[in-house]
Amino acid sequence: AVMSHLRLSDSNISSDLVRKGTANLILGMEPMEVLRYSEFLAPDGVIITAKEPFINIPNYPEIQGIYDKVNSFKGSRLVESVALAKEAGNAREVNMVVIGAAASVLPVKAETLKAAISELFAAKGADTVAKNLKAFDLGLGK
């Protein structure tokens, strides 16, 4: 699993690390993985994660228990990322679906994020841009 910290602020930031108990958002691609880092979540923070588990260990916990734990964090969401990515035109767009779902709690306007997505994927062609934007919008609607 990969973990990254991202801090956004209008003022100077003395460290790029997020202290435990202070994260406004934990964004994840796998439900059990986000729970491993839930101690970083602020009391009013939310978890947004892809719903689909990546079961790569023989003793993976019962999935409903994981869903229940994620849902115990107020405002948190399990996103049907694979189905939405397929609806967008490419099953590999799950990350963009999850980012779209997070857009409602990020301090950045969705239109700003969409402009960045368009710029980032422009070199890959209009079809790739369109699929990523559709995946983002589908996630945003969830």
PLM regions with names:
Residues 1-142:
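Active-site cofactor/cluster-binding pocket
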